[in-house]
UniProtKB/Swiss-Prot annotation:
Residues 15-242 form the AB hydrolase-1 domain. It is found in: Cytoplasm. NCBIfam families: bioH, PRK10349.1. One of its GO terms (molecular function) is pimelyl-[acyl-carrier protein] methyl ester esterase activity. It catalyses: 6-carboxyhexanoyl-[ACP] methyl ester + H2O = 6-carboxyhexanoyl-[ACP] + methanol + H(+). It holds the Pfam family Abhydrolase_1. This is Pimeloyl-[acyl-carrier protein] methyl ester esterase. GO terms for cellular component: cytoplasm. It comes from Escherichia coli O6:H1 (strain CFT073 / ATCC 700928 / UPEC). The active site is at S82 (nucleophile), D207, H235. Keywords: Biotin biosynthesis, Cytoplasm, Hydrolase, Serine esterase. Substrate binds at W22, S82, L83, F143, L144, A145, L146, Q147, H235. GO terms for biological process: biotin biosynthetic process. Its EC number is 3.1.1.85.
Length: 256
């Protein structure tokens, strides 16, 4: 049974697990890990098949969540960015006793556009899947460029993401494909109505992958949750607005 790459930093009395997004790895958190590890016991994770967590093929969302849980602390705040938000949400649904609070960042319970639901057009996701087999490095780079588009610091934010990707070997194509399949098919809108723990949802106003129109829709669907929109951020608010981002998490810690 393979273990995933897992790094623990800091001595805080509350555990915080950070789960990265599609195509990336835990190096994406280096812009905030020093600050967060001064407040939390921080856990940095490479999701199965990504970064240093080699030896995994494409997994379903449920299987990915179970693999991550095997090495996790008994109880933690779980924070997931983008695809990682679905993994953290799945853990909150299946093992609520392990989750002090759930935080999703630039994430949607249903990334794919549906009837009366804004999201990524299914043919765009299918196009990414098709292009992966042709030129997967270029496809990943295009996806990263989408994530920072529109922000004042778009160029340097995109460079930071690209550096994260290139710092480690690229994931296998089937792992990348499996991640896109999760983004294309999973819909947790209804299940997440009933999660019992504090639930904080963070968004970028300029996000091209998770449209801000979903925010009031989810405020209504999940009245027990809280939402916050970074006015000048896109898909990676922790890179463009690290201080504001960390401040929100430290404030959440006081409430759990």
């Amino acid at each position: 049974m393979n273990n995933i790459w897992w790094q623990t930093k800091g001595q805080g009395n509350v555990h915080l697990v950070l789960l990265h997004g599609w195509g990336l790895n835990a190096e994406v958190w280096r812009c905030i890990d020093e600050e967060l590890s001064s407040h939390f016991t921080l856990h940095l994770v490479d999701l199965p098949g990504f970064g240093r967590s080699r030896g995994f093929g494409a997994l379903s969302l449920a299987d990915m969540a179970e693999v991550v849980l095997r090495q996790a602390p008994d109880k933690a705040i779980w924070l997931g960015w983008s695809l990682g938000g679905l993994v953290a949400s799945q853990i909150a649904l299946t093992h609520p006793e392990r989750v002090l609070a759930l935080v999703t960042v630039a994430s949607s319970p249903c990334f794919s556009a549906r009837d009366e639901w804004p999201g990524i057009k299914p043919d765009v996701l299918a196009g990414f899947q098709q292009q992966l087999s042709d030129d997967f490095q270029r496809t990943v780079e295009r996806f990263l460029a989408l994530q920072t588009m529109g922000t004042e610091t778009a160029r340097q934010d995109a460079r930071a993401l690209k550096k994260t990707v290139l710092a480690l070997p690229m994931p296998e194509v089937d792992v990348l494909n499996g991640g896109l399949e999760i983004l294309k098919t999973v819909d947790l809108r209804q299940p997440l109505q009933n999660v019992p723990m504090p639930f904080l949802r963070l968004y970028g106003y300029l996000d091209g992958l998770v449209p801000r129109k979903v925010v009031p829709m989810l405020d209504k669907l999940w009245p027990h949750s809280e939402s916050y929109i970074f006015a000048k951020a896109a898909h990676a608010p922790f890179i463009s607005h690290p201080d504001e981002f960390c401040h929100l998490l430290v404030a959440l810690k006081q409430r759990v």
